[in-house]
Amino acid sequence: MNTKYSYGKVYQVVGPVVDVVFEKQDDLPKIYDCLIIDEPNMKLHLEVAQLIGDDIARCIAMGPTEGLARNVKVTSTNQPISVPVGTEVLGRMFNVIGEPIDEKKPIDASVKRMSIHRPAPSFADQSNELEIFETGIKVIDLLIPYAKGGKIGLFGGAGVGKTVLVQELIHNIATGHGGLSVFAGVGERTREGNDLYYEMIEGGVIDKTALVFGQMNEPPGARMRVALTGLTMAEYFRDVNNQDVLLFIDNIFRFTQAGSEVSALLGRMPSAVGYQPTLAEEMGSLQERITSTKSGSITSVQAIYVPADDLTDPAPSTTFTHLDAKTVLDRNIASLGIFPAVNPLDSTSRLLDPSVVGIQHYQTARKVQMILQKFLELQDIIAILGIDELSEEDKLTVSRARKIRNFLSQPFFVAEKFSGNKGKYVPISETIKGFSEIVEGKHDDLPEQAFFYVGSIDEAIERAKTLTRNG
């Protein structure tokens, strides 16, 4: 690793963009190199974004630039931003440059560090085996099974439950699989990160997780790079420790948004809807590194904010192309009080294939989707004429669809204190058994309320008995 330092000075400051001038052309840093300002009242990291002429490096600040003056000395490290990796990062919380922000002891200087800018694994190194990743969440395991080492997107507008679903997945992975997780909080609320940290301590899963945050209030440079910081930590567990690791990114839209801000600050001509012209390339450079290799896997779950609930917006639609499974959260389902508010018809997974999940799982999932699709088509008739005008067959379809819709709801462990319902982890075998019995008509006599917020089908049967007793 090159540790030769060179020195320049601040030439111009325009918000988070800092121009640094170097006297010697040989001292000029490379693109992505890290520059450091270390003054008594300010410690700031910069990343080189452009080289102007023979002597100026235009940089993006990774922290606030208030109080920065011209002619301040700048040290060029002649290497990209590097962050700590390995088991020492577990149970800790970091910022974009790998500094601990949890007020615990500093990271030891002997801990290995890796550059956040790394090439994606070569095609020869990648693994193409398909394996189901059990989450314990019924609607996901049945209709949109996740792939081990795959990329999963959680699409939804504001307030439909993306972050809660991510937190539940972290809980279930840590308790059910004992797996390692890396959580990258990209441009989201500080309060949510704080809550997540203390919930993980309470749930006993913090020792299996590394947390990296670049919140909403931070400059665009930090929000643009924090996903790479988290990914670098995950890559070390995969490539060096040969482990399977989960990478949670909340929210990938903020990564795009920060890139758009930086692009505008650098004076690039905007593209569609005001986004940066390099949108697809930036997204690809992140997503191509998230993959399974022959040594281990990174399974990534990415919450994706959808601006104005418009899935055709360039930010979510660019992300679509990289995903194995799309989990769409729907405001209409949330308004019915059904959580997780996953839309079972809009959500898709390339793993829902009989050769991967098996014939019984595939047929049950398809029957569930057919019943729900028929129910959707009948909604207008019911709204205009009433349910009594339907044929007996259609009435039965509506009854089963409502039971399925209710049975797709599930109490979450991380929402126990809000809902008062004890969280449930449902194995795939129980999920398939429950839904296959509903579509076969074995529970046509049970009231639909019995299926609301239960785990397995046996709980629904018990709930029905209780409802009958209470009249």
UniProtKB/Swiss-Prot annotation:
Recorded topology in the membrane: Peripheral membrane protein
Recorded catalytic activity of this chain's protein: ATP + H2O + 4 H(+)(in) = ADP + phosphate + 5 H(+)(out)
Entries under InterPro entries matching the protein: AAA+_ATPase (IPR003593), ATP-synt_VA_C (IPR055190), ATP_synth_F1_bsu (IPR005722), ATPase_a/bsu_AS (IPR020003), ATPase_alpha/beta_chains (IPR050053), ATPase_F1/V1/A1_a/bsu_N (IPR004100), ATPase_F1/V1/A1_a/bsu_N_sf (IPR036121), ATPase_F1/V1/A1_a/bsu_nucl-bd (IPR000194)
UniProt subcellular location: Cell membrane
A Pfam family the protein falls into: ATP-synt_VA_C
Binding positions for ATP per the UniProt entry: 156-163
UniProt main location, coarse: membrane
Keyword vocabulary terms for this entry: ATP synthesis, ATP-binding, Cell membrane, CF(1), Hydrogen ion transport, Ion transport, Membrane, Nucleotide-binding, Translocase, Transport
EC number, as in UniProt: 7.1.2.2
GO CC terms: plasma membrane; proton-transporting ATP synthase complex
CDD domains in the record: ATP-synt_F1_beta_C, ATP-synt_F1_beta_N, F1-ATPase_beta_CD
SUPFAM superfamilies: C-terminal domain of alpha and beta subunits of F1 ATP synthase (SSF47917), N-terminal domain of alpha and beta subunits of F1 ATP synthase (SSF50615), P-loop containing nucleoside triphosphate hydrolases (SSF52540)
A GO molecular-function annotation: ATP hydrolysis activity
Class of enzymatic activity (EC top level): translocase
Family assignment from sequence similarity: Belongs to the ATPase alpha/beta chains family.
UniProt subunit comment: F-type ATPases have 2 components, CF(1) - the catalytic core - and CF(0) - the membrane proton channel. CF(1) has five subunits: alpha(3), beta(3), gamma(1), delta(1), epsilon(1). CF(0) has three main subunits: a(1), b(2) and c(9-12). The alpha and beta chains form an alternating ring which encloses part of the gamma chain. CF(1) is attached to CF(0) by a central stalk formed by the gamma and epsilon chains, while a peripheral stalk is formed by the delta and b chains.
Biological role stated in the UniProt entry: Produces ATP from ADP in the presence of a proton gradient across the membrane. The catalytic sites are hosted primarily by the beta subunits.
Record-given protein name: ATP synthase subunit beta
Species, as recorded: Mycoplasmoides gallisepticum (strain R(low / passage 15 / clone 2)) (Mycoplasma gallisepticum)
